Amino acid sequence: MSDFLIGIDLGTSNSAVAYIDRSKGPDALVLDFPIVQPIRPSDVRPQPLLPSALYLQHPNELPVEAYALPWDPAPKQIVGEFARWQGAKVPSRLVTSAKSWLSHGGVDRTAPILPWGAPPDVEKMSPVEASSRLLLHIRNAWNRPNKRAIRAG
């Protein structure tokens, strides 16, 4: 059994993580978990919220070092704050509000439809895939070996 109880709020705009360290017993407190993410080119650090955004960069658009993560030196897409920032410049490559599409009755949530209205040269993903990638990012941030230093900070 894990020493931690973890709660994830996969939000339409932002996602958050809170946890309890069960090894602390009945005095355990609910604590926020800052989520490591790229903020700007080559600036990766923990933030209290993860914008629920993915940016599907063009292969030659940015050097991979600009959005590399401690657990993945060459991510397939940009996640979080940097995704939202870069997507403001190139909105046709930005996936946001993926969670809203999961319950939309007029679309196949497993079909590659996002970014909605993107030109044909932009590789699309499904709302399920986008939500899954956000959750995977959160899982990887939680599982990184030196996360305790961030939480203690």
Where are each of the predicted segments found?
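Gly/Thr-rich phosphate-binding beta-strand-loop-beta motif of the actin/hexokinase/Hsp70
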Residues: 2-28
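Phosphate-binding loop and its immediate beta->loop->alpha context
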Residues: 31-153
